Amino acid sequence: MKMKKLVKSSVASSIALLLLSNTVDAAQHITPVSEKKVDDKITLYKTTATSDNDKLNISQILTFNFIKDKSYDKDTLVLKAAGNINSGYKKPNPKDYNYSQFYWGGKYNVSVSSESNDAVNVVDYAPKNQNEEFQVQQTLGYSYGGDINISNGLSGGLNGSKSFSETINYKQESYRTTIDRKTNHKSIGWGVEAHKIMNNGWGPYGRDSYDPTYGNELFLGGRQSSSNAGQNFLPTHQMPLLARGNFNPEFISVLSHKQNDTKKSKIKVTYQREMDRYTNQWNRLHWVGNNYKNQNTVTFTSTYEVDWQNHTVKLIGTDSKETNPGV
């Protein structure tokens, strides 16, 4: 009898610990829907959903803007994906002598996809093209009849004909934004990748840079440095912020829904980080640097049920993955 009680107690404790662990790793919150009558044709319904994974150090902040337009035969959802993706940067061991390494954030990926039938499609997004600017600033404007316009800058050149606008504003020093090649009417994806990094006036270098003698000098301290391997790297404070700190994404996707079709659909939002491993090694003549791409990848996905009739969203599940955990 005592053994049975002990087993029951142990199982209960394990379940409680598991629930607590899940709560800590993935916290969610959805704000009440706010309603705003923009003009005699358009009504805006807005709600914000947050979904965090503390273990992966990834946070999603999603703003759902439902646009009900009397002059348009479809429902429009302007979804802004923001939040935080940590680089996962891990400092090298300063005591390493002839060889050392560290991990850094080489690329960040964000995607939004419609998991439903043809009733819901991706009809526009921002940014729309490759962008290498230090700071990406764009404005999406909507006017009655389903007209969408995307312009550079935070004002976007909006005029009185625009009934609604949403902006994106993020920094990507030494990185560039690209559009996923798999982007189509059901899915849109962006990649923000290390592109042109300067090293004490030399460069620019990228993830794939290579010299037959010195390798990839992306973060190499010095070719003939007398320092230990663990101290012969570009100082941390000189590395781009996205390589060693956090990336704060801001992307917009526009989804269109046929009004007479299904009232509910699913939308999946995925944030991902690719970590590279950078190494240096003394070959008895000079130092050689190398960069190994995508040595650790973490992915955090949230799936939402969208109620087009009531203009609400509900988180129906999260999923997290990591390749080569513990590096």
Curated annotation (Swiss-Prot):
A GO BP term, please? cytolysis in another organism
User: What is a single Pfam family found in this protein's UniProt entry?
Assistant: Leukocidin
Q: Gene3D superfamilies recorded for this chain?
A: Leukocidin/porin MspA
Q: Where is the signal peptide?
A: 1-26
The highest taxon in the source lineage is: Bacteria
Q: List the disulfide bonds.
A: none
Checking InterPro entries in the record gives: Bi-component_toxin_staph, Leukocidin/Hemolysin_toxin, Leukocidin/porin_MspA_sf
Keywords in alphabetical order, please.
Cytolysis, Hemolysis, Secreted, Signal, Toxin, Virulence
Q: Which GO terms describe its cellular component?
A: extracellular region
The places in or outside the cell where this protein is found are: Secreted
Q: Give GO MF terms, alphabetically.
A: toxin activity
The function of this protein is:
Part of a bi-component leucotoxin that acts by forming pores in the membrane of the target cells. The activity of LukEv-LukDv to rabbit leukocytes is similar to that of the Panton-Valentine leucocidin (PVL). LukEv-LukDv is hemolytic to rabbit red blood cells although the activity is only 8% of gamma-hemolysin.
Can you state the subunit structure given in the record? Toxicity requires sequential binding and synergistic association of a class S and a class F component which form heterooligomeric complexes. LukEv (class S) associates with LukDv (class F).
The family classification in the record reads: Belongs to the aerolysin family.
Name of the molecule in the record: Leucotoxin LukDv
This protein's species is: Staphylococcus aureus (strain NCTC 8325 / PS 47)
Gene, per the UniProt record: lukDv
